């Protein structure tokens, strides 16, 4: 797959993150190209000098950040992302293209937004509840008349989406299709909306209360994979447990009850997931000193002194819009590297993904703990 991004007279070298992954997936899509095309036409038409403060939201691996920096290195940019890998990927791609990132502000999805924005560029996320929250956040800071350009696949844009935009930010219209994408132009109506509250629900069979922020998987119920995992947790005593890809933290919360001597580390690529886990730890009145929370690309930046004797993992097989197993493979490799001798990796996965093949190759052993028609619980021990 090509790594050369070329549109509107710009040429960039862009790779996904981590760059060493063997993949046929690009670091951008046609919607990125379409946004830049529309923006370039807008800049030429308005001849705006100097460029005005701009926010870039949901920029997968920095295509938009790199393009705007290449167009004008003095462009005041704020890049907002929930995914650690998106932020790390954007930084790598800026460096790869010898672009200066010093002037870029990097914000998480929950951080207060700048008050001086004149333009917003967005990619449409899969999660529309998260998208609605992002729009409502923008409604609190954007003056009336501010344009928000949103790129997406043409098939994802319909009347319901236009209605959602009008409800949460302002009137919107879609461009003509180009490379099977459209760019929506939404104009802020200047009316501030309140942010939605986290969704809270109970898991009575484990005496747990769960609170989910908008971009966390399984927003208002226990997902099937987590349920079978909770029913088949490892027996024994553990001192250090990692909930890898923690989501709302349900596995780590259950581990805290089962293994009272253990310290639990919650790790996720999503900042909202980590925040939800931390909120749920407090919600269930667990001792603060027994937990640590990490916004990270798997265990890439976890302190080397942390040597777990148990890693719990419900790996995703999506990265944004892309279906890929490289995240699971990275999780398994990180677990193998970080587990102490005799430590256990305990995972749940869809049967058709054949994770047992990868685990047997990596650890030299793999045991099927439980299974049903859709999911399988697998366990490997580090020698």
UniProtKB/Swiss-Prot annotation:
One Gene Ontology cellular component: cytoplasm
Protein name: Ribosomal RNA large subunit methyltransferase G
Keyword Methyltransferase in annotation: yes
Organism expressing this protein natively: Shewanella denitrificans (strain OS217 / ATCC BAA-1090 / DSM 15013)
Gene: rlmG
Listed CDD domains: AdoMet_MTases
Entry keywords, A to Z: Cytoplasm, Methyltransferase, rRNA processing, S-adenosyl-L-methionine, Transferase
Protein family (similarity comment): Belongs to the methyltransferase superfamily. RlmG family.
Compartments (UniProt record): Cytoplasm
